[in-house]
């Protein structure tokens, strides 16, 4: 949407000015967050709950590990490490919450959560465990076979998926401009 270039432009300008971005997440409607260095950040129109989590992690001198904002900004997640403990915070569907709680009850530490507005998801744990919705099962399997352990994930509402792995980046159904950069 051409009317949204200004907010995204503000965030990309911030990245260029700082000459770094450790993690970034953008929505289709202009919501965005860029994490730099040890947790410096720029944001535009973040949901208050997500902003509160970012501020709390910084106050506790934690480190933000992973962020996700869905394409329309309805759902979000922040994975952080505070006092050497991995913590997730999210606004997500009940199905995704149930998966996150089930993994935690098994002693799994979540390091990445990617989701869309339709409850499709990829959850990555530090021990290599992956939970995902059926839509991404084949993609996850192919990525692991080709590039090894999955370290982080990103998904789109249109079934697109990017998986960062030990030995490379695997992607499916993403715009060619994004694929060219990867």
Language model feature labels by segment:
Residues 1, 25-39, 66, 71-84, ...:
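Short beta-strand motif characteristic of blades in beta-propeller domains
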Residues 1-19, 41-63, 85-108, 129-149, ...:
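Trp- and S/T/G-rich repeat-edge/linker motifs of beta-rich repeat architectures
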Residues 19-24, 62-71, 100-101, 108-118, ...:
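Repeated scaffold domains used in trafficking and secretory/extracellular systems
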């Amino acid at each position: 949407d051409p009317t949204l270039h200004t907010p995204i432009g503000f965030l990309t300008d911030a990245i260029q000015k700082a000459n770094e971005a450790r993690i970034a997440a953008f929505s289709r409607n202009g919501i965005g967050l860029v994490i730099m260095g040890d947790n410096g950040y720029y944001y535009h129109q973040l949901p208050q709950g997500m902003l509160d989590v970012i501020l709390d992690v910084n106050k506790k001198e934690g480190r933000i590990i992973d962020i996700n904002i869905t394409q329309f900004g309805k759902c979000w997640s922040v994975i952080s490490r505070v006092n050497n403990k991995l913590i997730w915070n999210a606004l997500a569907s009940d199905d995704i919450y149930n998966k996150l709680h089930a993994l935690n009850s098994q002693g799994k530490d979540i390091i990445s959560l990617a989701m869309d507005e339709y409850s499709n998801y990829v959850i990555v744990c530090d021990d290599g465990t992956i939970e995902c919705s059926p839509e991404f099962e084949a993609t996850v399997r192919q990525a692991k076979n080709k590039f090894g352990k999955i370290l982080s994930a990103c998904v789109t509402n249109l079934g697109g998926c990017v998986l960062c792995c030990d030995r490379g980046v695997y992607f499916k159904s993403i715009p060619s401009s994004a694929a060219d950069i990867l």
